Amino acid sequence: MADILTRIETYKREEIASAKRARPLGEVTAAAKAAPPPRGFTDTIRAKLARGDYALIAEIKKASPSKGLIRADFDPPSLARAYEAGGAACLSVLTDAPSFQGHLDFMVAARAATSLPVLRKDFIFDTYQVVEARAHGADCILIIMAALDDDAAKDIEATALDLGMDVLLEIHNREELDRALKLRSPMIGVNNRNLRTFETTLETSEGLAPYIPKERLMVGESGIFTPADLARLERVGISTFLVGESLMRQADVTAATRTLLKHA
């Protein structure tokens, strides 16, 4: 199986270099500082959990490398409103174009359509992307531990925190978890999809959950389709979930979101 993450890093670094030429860091930093203040991503999730509810990070994703086009009638503002009406706590919006047909404009439009905090879902390799995310209104960014060394992860996290943003630290195995726990952000996302093979199993979350300290906020990501999947992960202490594809494919996204969030 080809190493998908390595291929992605190659084109992302080309994208970043091009973006820096088009819009220098100083200009983007000024835009980030002038942007409306971040909506508390982690705080919103904790408030949902404190009420005894599941906390759903609902994903807006047009396509994926493994499945191709997910939704033809793709309208980020409508999807954002549908997720909000269905009970989602936060939004995640794909902004990567080559693999996911995403765009920063999709995130801007989704955030403007709701009051929910928004995660920029992308492959972050450079602090420039963090500042760029805030300049476009992002409330949270993703750090994929498999994609970064410790120094890069620390620098990217520090940039996000300095801008008032939250960070979702994504892991897939014990080694990545141990590295993530050295960082400051409380949210630890366990990706049930192996980013090097794109194979998915909930056993990944079940196996790693016992090693995540209780004061951290565990997030289950990928391979989550039914209320039974949520109940299965809840049994190992995960009550926050990032779900995209299974909801994006439904005709009535609001109804599908409500159905998913019903406690088993």
Curated annotation (Swiss-Prot):
The keyword Amino-acid biosynthesis applies. PROSITE patterns: IGPS (PS00614). Pathway: Amino-acid biosynthesis; L-tryptophan biosynthesis; L-tryptophan from chorismate: step 4/5. GO terms for biological process: L-tryptophan biosynthetic process. It catalyses: 1-(2-carboxyphenylamino)-1-deoxy-D-ribulose 5-phosphate + H(+) = (1S,2R)-1-C-(indol-3-yl)glycerol 3-phosphate + CO2 + H2O. The keyword Oxidoreductase does not apply. GO terms for molecular function: indole-3-glycerol-phosphate synthase activity; phosphoribosylanthranilate isomerase activity. PANTHER family: INDOLE-3-GLYCEROL-PHOSPHATE SYNTHASE, TRYPTOPHAN BIOSYNTHESIS PROTEIN. This is Indole-3-glycerol phosphate synthase. Keywords: Amino-acid biosynthesis, Aromatic amino acid biosynthesis, Decarboxylase, Lyase, Tryptophan biosynthesis. Its EC number is 4.1.1.48. SUPFAM superfamilies: Ribulose-phoshate binding barrel (SSF51366). Belongs to the TrpC family.
